[in-house]
């Protein structure tokens, strides 16, 4: 009997998870792509991969200078 109640409890958890997933608001791919394209064009001036860095000092990926003490 204990195995049966355990299985029933597991099934209830699964059903609740499926209900939560079914309640999620879905969007079509065309809507999502349009929103993404709009966001990208609005923020392209802030994208360092497109515009580059204004100077090497603000570039966090520049090679670090090393100090060697003899």
Swiss-Prot record:
SUPFAM superfamilies: Transducin (heterotrimeric G protein), gamma chain. One of its GO terms (molecular function) is G-protein beta-subunit binding. It comes from the Eukaryota. It is a lipid-anchor. One of its GO terms (biological process) is convergent extension involved in gastrulation. The keyword Lipoprotein applies. GO terms for cellular component: heterotrimeric G-protein complex. A lipid is attached at residue 67 (S-geranylgeranyl cysteine). Its main location: membrane. The modification Cysteine methyl ester is found at residue 67. Guanine nucleotide-binding proteins (G proteins) are involved as a modulator or transducer in various transmembrane signaling systems. The beta and gamma chains are required for the GTPase activity, for replacement of GDP by GTP, and for G protein-effector interaction. G proteins are composed of 3 units, alpha, beta and gamma. Belongs to the G protein gamma family. This is Guanine nucleotide-binding protein subunit gamma-1. It comes from Drosophila melanogaster. The gene is Ggamma1.
């Amino acid at each position: 009997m204990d195995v049966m109640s355990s299985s029933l409890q597991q099934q209830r958890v699964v059903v609740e998870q499926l209900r939560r997933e079914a309640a999620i608001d879905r969007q079509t791919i065309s809507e999502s792509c349009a929103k993404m394209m709009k966001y990208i064009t609005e923020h392209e001036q802030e994208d360092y991969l497109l515009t580059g860095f204004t100077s090497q000092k603000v570039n966090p990926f520049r090679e670090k200078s090393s100090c060697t003490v003899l």
